[in-house]
Structures are given as structure tokens and as C-alpha cells.
Amino acid sequence: MRDEIATTVFFVTRLVKKHDKLSKQQIEDFAEKLMTILFETYRSHWHSDCPSKGQAFRCIRINNNQNKDPILERACVESNVDFSHLGLPKEMTIWVDPFEVCCRYGEKNHPFTVASFKGRWEEWELYQQISYAVSRASSDVSSGTSCDEESCSKEPRVIPKVSNPKSIYQVENLKQPFQSWLQIPRKKNVVDGRVGLLGNTYHGSQKHPKCYRPAMHRLDRIL
């Protein structure tokens, strides 16, 4: 649950940063509130033994019928951020499920995987997948094979990690990680160790990018 929620917050925040309407401090405040709210909301609806259970409940959704998702709107209110300044797609759905985070741009398009924790992924591949998902927000959502320069790089990135499993729902334990991970460096050459997506250091081998990964059918939250 910690990895999935941290990934979701990182993904949403990358979209917000791309819109470039909020200051660094505003983004940090919004990210802290969003992570706290997601933990509070999902902790009683998380079923690792049956990931599809509660899927519709764990659905963050924006469309023409509801242009403000309640969870995102609450995070904005509690962080004093204008929802319109997030710059999120007008039609976007994010499913936060055990072992997998999926997204769909447009109500009629197919969902795709943002990050999967089902198998062994190199952590740079997880970042790469999230970066590609972000790039799809401003590109043709029907295309699914190419990667832009940023999404295909293997540069280090860090997603916030809640290190204490006994206190993951306490607000004070969620604040600290956000001070550094939002400071995303631009292109860097990394030869040996890499900083992992969830804060670990490891040595990755050269592999071809996975990029687009279609997801299985998902249950929408009824608006």
C-alpha cells in the first residue's frame, strides 16, 4: 500500500509540475496532504488477497460529469491550492490497487499500467513507466509504443517512501520525505549505483524500456 500510494502521489505531482502553475512549496504542501488523505481513505479498503475488491472505491476520477475528484479537491483545500492550477487532464481516471497503479486518459480509451509491483522490475523502469504515463497526458492517447527523451532515460529519481510501517497513517510521519523528492534533477549520466524509485540504491543493468503496458479492465467509480 505504501509503494502504490507513493507512486500515485508522484505521478499526480509530475502532472502538476508539467502544468507549471504552482510553486515548489505549493506542490510540496499538496503532495503531503494528498498522501495523507489517500492513506486515511484507502486503509480500510485495501485487500491484497483480492486486489480487485474495492477497486471502484479506490478510483480517482475526473470527467465532464465531475470535474473535481473529491480526494484531489480535499487535498487542494487543505493545502490552500487552487484546483484549477493543478492542470490535470479533463478526463482522467487513476486506479490505486494492491500491486498496481493504472491510469486512463479519456473516458473511452483503454487503461494502461503506470507502475506494477507484481513482478521484478528494475526501479529505473518504474520511474520510466511513470514518466511515460505523464507524457501521454499531452500526446495522442491512442499511441502507445514510443517514448520521449525524458521517459526513456535511466537517470535517478526518488519517490517518497514511508519507512515506518507502524505509523504510515500519521501525518507527522508523511511530511519528511517530500522535502527532497520534488527536486527532480535534469539529465545526468549515471555509471554505477542508481537511486531507486522508492529511495533505494542499487545497480541496474541495461535493458530496453517497457514503456506502454496495457492494463486489464478496471471498475469505474460511479459518479
Curated annotation (Swiss-Prot):
Q: Which InterPro entries does this entry report, sorted A to Z?
A: Anti_prolifrtn (IPR002087), BTG (IPR033332), BTG-like_sf (IPR036054)
Q: In which tissues is it expressed?
A: Expressed in oocytes after germinal vesicle breakdown. Expressed in testis and in olfactory epithelium.
**GO cellular component terms, A-Z:** cytoplasm; nucleus
Report keywords, A-Z: Disease variant
Specify whether Membrane is a keyword of the entry. Answer: no
Query: Which GO biological process categories is it annotated with?
Result: negative regulation of cell population proliferation; neuron differentiation; regulation of cell cycle
- RNA-binding as UniProt keyword: no
Tell me the subunit arrangement.
Interacts with CNOT7. Interacts with EIF4E. Interacts with CNOT8.
Question: What disease is recorded for this protein?
Answer: Oocyte/zygote/embryo maturation arrest 8: An autosomal recessive infertility disorder due to failure of the fertilized ovum to undergo zygotic cleavage.
Assigned protein family = Belongs to the BTG family.
- Specify the protein name: Protein BTG4
Organism, scientific name = Homo sapiens
